[in-house]
Amino acid sequence: MPSNSIFGGAAQAAPPSEALPVICLAGPTGSGKTAAALAVAEALGGEVINADSRQVYADFPRITAQPSAEELACCPHHLYGFLPTAQKISAGRWAAQAQATARQILSRGKIPLLVGGTGLYFQTLLHGTAEIPPVDPALTAAFTARLEDVGSQAMHAELARVDPDYATRIHPNDRQRIVRALEVHAATGKPFTWWHKHAMSRPPCNGPLLVLDAPLPWLEPRLARRLDMMLESGAMDEAAAALKNCDDDDAPGWTGIGCAEALAFLRGRLGFDACRDLWLRNTRAYAKRQLTWFRARPEAVWLPPDNVDAVVKAAGVRLPAGV
């Protein structure tokens, strides 16, 4: 592994008050981020930090497509599979952990490489987080109870009336984010998106946002093959084991794509073929939303998904000051 000195000296941690220099590698699900990340880490002397909100869960390494044991052995990886299914993690809490991890990596003379597909994580990391006042837990409980009563579709429609911009960014079944946006609007009188535009904290990190440009026609057959490989290699057994650890359908870990469909199969709400079809449709829709989100980021640097050399080169010439 080459020394970082060819890129301006050994990586050094920034003072606590300064944004930490990092490289961000993003893209839609199934676009080949893991392979590209390993190539960048090997070429530049990096360590990988997970930036995918589903890959934080310990019970679902296969279903959430976490790096394999062989891939994990190629270089140090951080923030993968550390959270129980019953727990949730906010973007702000993740960013704090990612920042602390990046600081440790820099202190070792290595480059922090953030890898994933969760746009909100990258937004929080590179642009800060909205400093929203605390919401009364009773208000949260009231909206949660109402969601149970009328369903997520109706609540999503309500969100579309008070915060149409945010409603277009989240899935109508994303119960946690729907409740969060509605409670913030009710508590503050301002839409969730207003807070993210006008009350942002200091960004914890700084660096390029490299995005794999994987169009849907290219992605679709890859997503289908990956799903079939997951199912053939024991995805349902993994879900069944997770159910023994957390028998709560509303637990945060069960809300992700793949986890929710597998749970529906295990509960007898879907047959196997219907489960696979829904899983694939939802994965495709998610990839489309990811592409839409990243295309709206003016700082994104788009790169071919099937050319890791191009990704390595782009990362090398865009290293932020301090690494």
Swiss-Prot record:
GO terms for molecular function: ATP binding; tRNA dimethylallyltransferase activity. It comes from Desulfovibrio desulfuricans (strain ATCC 27774 / DSM 6949 / MB). PANTHER family: TRNA DIMETHYLALLYLTRANSFERASE. Catalyzes the transfer of a dimethylallyl group onto the adenine at position 37 in tRNAs that read codons beginning with uridine, leading to the formation of N6-(dimethylallyl)adenosine (i(6)A). InterPro entries: Dimethylallyltransferase, IPT, P-loop_NTPase. The record marks 118 as: Interaction with substrate tRNA. Residues 52-55, 176-180 are annotated as: Interaction with substrate tRNA. Transmembrane segments: none annotated. Substrate binds at residues 29-34. ATP binds at residues 27-34. Its cofactor is Mg(2+). It catalyses: adenosine(37) in tRNA + dimethylallyl diphosphate = N(6)-dimethylallyladenosine(37) in tRNA + diphosphate. It comes from the Bacteria. Its EC number is 2.5.1.75. This is tRNA dimethylallyltransferase. Keywords: ATP-binding, Magnesium, Nucleotide-binding, Transferase, tRNA processing. The gene is miaA. Monomer. It is an enzyme of class 2 (transferase). Belongs to the IPP transferase family.
